């Protein structure tokens, strides 16, 4: 399985909303991301669904600055996709 395929598989969560947001990132911004952002994305995927949802909706802010920045980037991507 390719790295992209593995990531998309890891993006399959218990919530369709999370699936869509995470896949949007993999299909777009992930390819241009630097190594540290890619590592942060993989750490983000390690979060439980409820914690990930709170981070991506802005209800919680991760202590890890890289995860907080990535969550903000994902929120911005969703905003751009909605326009």
From Swiss-Prot:
Specify the domain of life of the species encoding this protein. Bacteria
User: In terms of one coarse class, where is the protein primarily found?
Assistant: cytoplasm
Does the keyword Chaperone feature in the UniProt annotation? Answer: yes
Recorded hits in Pfam families, A to Z, give: Sdh5 (PF03937)
**Keywords from the UniProt entry:** Chaperone, Cytoplasm
**Keyword Zinc-finger on entry:** no
Q: Which InterPro entries match?
A: SDH, SDH_sf, SdhE_FAD_assembly_factor
The entry's cellular-component GO terms read:
cytoplasm
Q: Its Gene Ontology biological processes? A: succinate metabolic process
List locations, semicolon-separated. Answer: Cytoplasm
Please describe what this protein does. An FAD assembly protein, which accelerates covalent attachment of the cofactor into other proteins. Plays an essential role in the assembly of succinate dehydrogenase (SDH, respiratory complex II), an enzyme complex that is a component of both the tricarboxylic acid cycle and the electron transport chain, and which couples the oxidation of succinate to fumarate with the reduction of ubiquinone (coenzyme Q) to ubiquinol. Required for flavinylation (covalent attachment of FAD) of the flavoprotein subunit SdhA of SDH and other flavinylated proteins as well.
The family annotation for this protein states: Belongs to the SdhE FAD assembly factor family.
Protein known as: FAD assembly factor SdhE
What organism does the UniProt record list as the source?
Methylococcus capsulatus (strain ATCC 33009 / NCIMB 11132 / Bath)
Gene encoding this polypeptide? sdhE
